[in-house]
Amino acid sequence: MTEEHRLISAESVTEGHPDKVCDQISDAILDDLLAQDSSSHVAVETSAATGVFLVFGEVTSEGYCDVQSKVRETLRNIGYTSSEVGLDADSCGVVVAITEQSAEINQGVARLTDDQETAASREERYEAQGAGDQGVMFGYATDETPTLMPLPIYLAHRLAFRLTEVRKSGEVPHLRPDGKTQVTIEYDDDDKPVRLDTVLISTQHDPEVTQDWLAVELKKHVIDPVLDEVLGSKVPHDNYRQLVNPTGSFILGGPAADAGLTGRKIIVDTYGGAAHHGGGAFSGKDPSKVDRSAAYATRWVAKNIVAAGLAHKVEIQIAYAIGVADPVSVNVETFGTEQGVTRGQIAAAVRKVFDLRPAAIIDELDLKRPIYLKTAAYGHFGRTDVEFPWEKTDKVEELKAAIAAE
């Protein structure tokens, strides 16, 4: 590796990781409530320890969620069905401490009644719904992968997803739900990925498994297929370091081995460290919370900019004040990669094309639907196994037209 080259790493985790278990429980509850009442206001957190889960937070909804049943259903779907794997969905403890949303918060994002919705114009409605909290959010896109995601996090997610696939299908026997992946990519001085350096997989397994057998099986059924799919002939990967369970056996996993908590994998959820993060987590929050909806919107904006060929990579920063509809600020950073336009022109086009008020985001991306459980593992962005509305590139022509009109 030359002095100008850099090594960049990113990690992912499987759905059986204790923090991801908590994310999925929180989003399963959110989806259940949104399916009954699309205007539900939800902020639900989950914590996990050995054999017990605490579900807590605030909810205002016309719907009802049987939280205990939803927790157990989620755990069964992940694969925690026996004390042998460290957790039995049917016998674990579930403690629920959910209250109503604060009236002081609710007044800033109060739900519009049917009468108000009918009488008010869309513009009035957009002005009426302020942000659910203050905060700063970021969105990012880069043209180094077809999904416009950074290669390290995209590859790490694909490995984690495949690891779960072979576990659930039985293609690789003796695997258990908990697992992590990490990849390291070498970049040249033009910031282009030029070589795969390292692949790391740590996976929970049955006691009878040997480490040599596991390394061979994971290379054959997980690593090689994913590398061929993602890297192909574009990025050399014929001489990389493979690490499988480098500490040795990994029999005890999940919440039996480590406590879990909603919102503790925010870099895994987003861009693997390639972009800034405002600090707000996603799971368990309805779209009135800009931590979630604005992060999705900024990804949508960034992806359309790159898809339009205006820049090779872009980061969008947005900030809000609680109870105020219009963003406090919107910043566009192209890292000097803009193509035939200035950064100022791109920023002006963004302001013209995208309405980033919370209610407008919710409408444009159709966010008041039960679509969130699938986001809670393997990343919220750049997915190929499921379609999310913030991944659409439907504003490309409008952005080009806005640039041309300046």
Curated annotation (Swiss-Prot):
Coiled coil: none annotated. One of its GO terms (molecular function) is methionine adenosyltransferase activity. Catalyzes the formation of S-adenosylmethionine (AdoMet) from methionine and ATP. The overall synthetic reaction is composed of two sequential steps, AdoMet formation and the subsequent tripolyphosphate hydrolysis which occurs prior to release of AdoMet from the enzyme. Belongs to the AdoMet synthase family. The keyword Magnesium applies. Mg(2+) binds at residue 19. Binds 2 divalent ions per subunit. Binds 1 potassium ion per subunit. InterPro entries: ADOMET_SYNTHASE_CS, S-AdoMet_synt_C, S-AdoMet_synt_central, S-AdoMet_synt_N, S-AdoMet_synthetase, S-AdoMet_synthetase_sfam. ATP binds at residues 17, 178-180, 258, 264-265, 281, 285. Keywords: ATP-binding, Cytoplasm, Magnesium, Metal-binding, Nucleotide-binding, One-carbon metabolism, Potassium, Transferase. Its cofactor is Mg(2+); K(+). Residues 101-111 are annotated as: Flexible loop. One of its GO terms (biological process) is one-carbon metabolic process. K(+) binds at residue 45. It is found in: Cytoplasm. Homotetramer; dimer of dimers. It is an enzyme of class 2 (transferase). Its EC number is 2.5.1.6. Pathway: Amino-acid biosynthesis; S-adenosyl-L-methionine biosynthesis; S-adenosyl-L-methionine from L-methionine: step 1/1. This is S-adenosylmethionine synthase. L-methionine binds at residues 58, 101, 258, 289. One of its GO terms (cellular component) is cytoplasm. Gene3D superfamilies: 3.30.300.10. Its main location: cytoplasm.
